[in-house]
Amino acid sequence: MGDPLERLGSQASMATESVMKEDLCLEIDPPLTESVATAEDWRRALGKVVPAVVVLRTTACRAFDTESAGASYATGFIVDKRRGIILTNRHVVKPGPVVAEAMFVNREEIPIYPVYRDPVHDFGFFCYDPSAVQFLTYQEIPLAPEAASVGLEIRVVGNDSGEKVSILAGTLARLDRDAPHYKKDGYNDFNTFYMQAASGTKGGSSGSPVIDWQGRAVALNAGSKSSSASAFFLPLQRVVRALSFLQKSIDSRTDKPKAVHIPRGTLQMTFLHKGFDEIRRLGLRSETEQVVRHASPTGETGMLVVDSVVPSGPADKHLEPGDVLVRVNGTVLTQFLNLENLLDDGVGQILELEIERGGQPLSVSVSVQDLHSITPDHFLEVSGAVIHPLSYQQARNFRFPCGLAYVADPGYMLFRAGVPRHAIIKKVANEDISSLGDLVSVLSKLSRGARVPLEYMSHTDRHRKKSVLVTIDHHEWYAPPQLYTRNDSSGLWDAKPAIEPASVSPSIGNNGFPISQDISLCHHDTEPMHEVNVRGVTDIAAIMETSSGDGSQNDFGSEAKKQRVDEDSSDGIAANGSLYGSEFKSDDAMETDTTVLRDFEGATALSANASLAERAIEPALVMFEVHVPPSCSLDGVHSQHFFGTGIIIYHSSNMGLAVVDKNTVAISASDVMLSFAAFPVEIPGEVVFLHPVHNYALIAYNPSAMDPASASVIRAAELLPEPALQRGDSVYLVGLSRNLQATSRKSIVTNPCAALNIGSADSPRYRATNMEVIELDTDFGSSFSGALTDEQGRIRAIWGSFSTQVKYSSTSSEDHQFVRGIPVYAISQVLEKIITGGNGPALLINGVKRPMPLVRILEVELYPTLLSKARSFGLSDEWIQVLVKKDPVRRQVLRVKGCLAGSKAENLLEQGDMVLAVNKMPVTCFNDIEAACQTLDKGSYSDENLNLTILRQGQELELVVGTDKRDGNGTTRVINWCGCVVQDPHPAVRALGFLPEEGHGVYVTRWCHGSPAHRYGLYALQWIVEVNGKKTPDLNAFADATKELEHGQFVRIRTVHLNGKPRVLTLKQDLHYWPTWELRFDPETALWRRNILKALQ
């Protein structure tokens, strides 16, 4: 990996010469000949320089301003040995939180911390403890900006392309090049000249010294153009000034470090240096040109022209693009350096500018602003989002005023609402937001679960504001809001709570009204804000990773699953806000409610083309929208956003249950919203049951959270598990369109018992196994889900979505989905146990504890084989006749594909075994195995074993195989350590048939950008089996092992990859930015709770 800025590709030019999109990377060119210096001179110079050049390994712990969270490498060099000062680029030092180490040529590695990053120009300083370098003799590299001249032969000494030490040759060709333009929405230097040479630098050489034959640094390498061999170097005049301030600040310290202050002034405007020929075309008068040429140094070829002005800045309303600068305070000025001297030394003073605008001379007075006052030094972290005042850099890019509430990373809460990165927040809960303090004040009035409107602007569509609904996290997915402030004396960003718990107000209900305290679900709504994770995942985007390579999880899996979300992410969500009116609230309005309700029902019933089945089932249809927090991307879930149609199967005054496929609700750690077809209302739901085998989940909602009008019109569908569908039967496929309109068609069952065979994904996730599904002759496509009903609207099957991964090659794959019918017999059995009381642990549902069912399963993956094929594998004619008599339709036998690792069947059954009978009863389908397991629970004795008759390599065997009981909770505990998310191996991982020999270990399911796990390569898809020699067979052992680790300690980790390859790596724990915490589902409160396991005191 390389420096992020150095890996940017060049882009098309916006103008003919000056505004080109260059790429920050480092280049290699053959050395030029005819050098004025001898080879011995260069050897001596390089002998001094190379030991003073260091490789910088930086980790941006949070997204901030123009930078994203991540790890990179670059170059720096020692400019003050006694004080321990390293010079490098600003985009290496980073404007936000950063952790860095410097490695010398002798492989000594020392910690360094940032002390200054220039707000505009591409340079910054790290500091280190000189006494930490024990085994290397080195000298500082002197800075000589005056030595730079056209034709000077130079060497660039740096970490080119990660090669530790590289020496690239070149010749300075220009000293007055325009500052390179890297990105429209990222960091760019301006108001300075750059130097140019054909030295061919690439990624990793940012911050390298550009030296002459005497070993002096004449410039600082900053970037390059990827389409050519041109490298761009920053002049050092302003670097020398900043260094002198930094040295004086260090010398003035007593016993306690203090932050350095380097005066910097600004007018919040950008100048370009244009030639006299172009300035004449702008209307420059001839007499003015004569005066300027006469007063300027010999060889001056142009003047400074205003390129852009930041709104609400000191120059706004005074200067305009195209204005030509003639004099400042009565002196002719044509160079950036002279202007910057006046600005930096005149903070708070008034400058008199003489300009020409279209040939008309004008004079303006402008106040010089402190540049540091518009450079953000703090940010708010809430629900994984990073929000801070809009910086001068981005204000210049986007043409917004400085200081607005800027989204550097949307995290989870804002991403869920559709707020993008780089957005400007204008309103929250109908209150204006003009600064970060306003946002904190509004958030302090909101509580968990509150849904409020948010208004934002984007630079890509700056003339229109967008409104969305933001939901404050109901569960403790992340830490409470934290306010981070930069501390230049320590190099760290210090965190403190942004909101005091006492300031949290009562919860707001789903309809926008306070929930009364007598409603059973309110036990969690009235609690103060709890912790909600220190860092989101970027990536989403943030996004976080689930593969062992780059681990990108930005792809949302199925295109169909995300299509509606992409198209409706703003306007659709905003429209939902209008559904929460007050007209259906009070008892006094019941008569009006009934009238409105009657009209709504009439409109539905009078639908011209609606079938009887469609009208009967429509009150039971519900649309699910599901969001998965990046901090809880468990069990290999392949997206953060899902939607699909579900069916209400139970509805009473105190509990409602809806069923939906597991490609919509994949894991229990999710935020679920339900929109009902029967009435325009949207309420949250909670995952209460995930079937361990079958592709369905049960979601509970609280009918008392609705008003009586909406609750009364909703109906539960009638399930009809018997008789089973047969080939040729007519059914109605009913579901919801994107606008929540019921849609149906009549179809014919072509195969009522099609066996599924879904392969494993690259990143193991749930896949339906041991299931028979229903196939139809026609449907509505792979993105339409719903139900199969008879003519009366009774549910015969769920028409659900299944996730699969299509692999085109060993390195290329794509997520897809398909839809099939899921018989309702298994659903009806679980539903009955939930209503009457199951045999498992209790779960709090809408304030009432209900015993949940346990499901007994044989943890073996099976697949059917035709009897004609089975005969070739040694199946006898007698058994063939028995199986045909048992099931003349299927004419198949079940074979073992594999056993789940850690199951009771492991080491008993082998791949390829044919299962002929269970308890002496022939079996031909998955239902036979499932029925045998259920029979064990009905017996009067507690027998957990099945007597299997199998055929193995032509030999008939009798085996006693144990079964396993599983609940429907899914994964309920996860630990975040050093930015990697670990959990117990989930069934999809165990289905691979492998667990480490060193004990099962804890499974790394994902990692976070900018974390120690990212920095040291502790990626996903592997088990951690040892921490500092201590075995970690489960999460309890892992938690105990990590609690003993201290901040800054190097930790030795032993891992085993999914392919069985062991590995040992080390990483450095960082408890300041990445404390160790766990997230655990609490069945007593039905909440996900976040607990800190280890953090700095």
UniProtKB/Swiss-Prot annotation:
Residues 55-243 are annotated as: Serine protease. The active site is at H524, S785. GO terms for biological process: photoinhibition; proteolysis. It is found in: Cytoplasm. Transmembrane segments: none annotated. Residues 269-366 form the PDZ domain. Residues 546-556 have a biased composition (Polar residues). Disulfide bonds: none annotated. It comes from the Eukaryota. The keyword Repeat does not apply. Keywords: Cytoplasm, Hydrolase, Protease, Serine protease. Coiled coil: none annotated. InterPro entries: PDZ, PDZ-like_dom, PDZ_sf, Peptidase_S1_PA, Peptidase_S1_PA_chymotrypsin, Peptidase_S1C. One of its GO terms (cellular component) is chloroplast. Belongs to the peptidase S1C family. This is Protease Do-like 7. The gene is DEGP7.
